[in-house]
Design a protein with these regions (language model features):
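Detector for the mature cores of small, proteolytically processed
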Residues: 1-91
Length: 91
């Protein structure tokens, strides 16, 4: 599952995000300001590959720009909050 939030009125609470990803949340800020929320322990729990979120990750963190992380992958449900929709999750 991959959910994209592009309106601040749809921004999830912490509890809603935890329920969606199935556990503790980990947030990653993308260079463009978008914010990805994943299950912090997803890889330890052997959650299935999230192809959509992984494709987004790899198209953003490319080898020519980043020394580490470009070949990483996302597992389990994920939420992408677009920069314009960030309020409570804004860093």
């Amino acid at each position: 599952m991959f959910k994209i939030i592009d309106d601040v009125k749809n921004e999830p609470t912490l509890e809603e995000a935890q329920k969606f990803v199935g556990g503790y949340v980990e947030g990653i800020t993308f260079p463009n300001g978008d914010y990805l929320i994943v299950n912090e322990e997803g890889k330890l729990q052997n959650l299935p590959l999230n192809v959509e979120a992984t494709n987004l990750w790899r198209s953003t963190f490319t080898k020519d720009k980043y020394m580490i992380g470009y070949d990483d992958f996302v597992v389990g449900p994920a939420i992408l909050i677009k920069k314009a929709a960030l309020k409570e999750w804004a860093a």
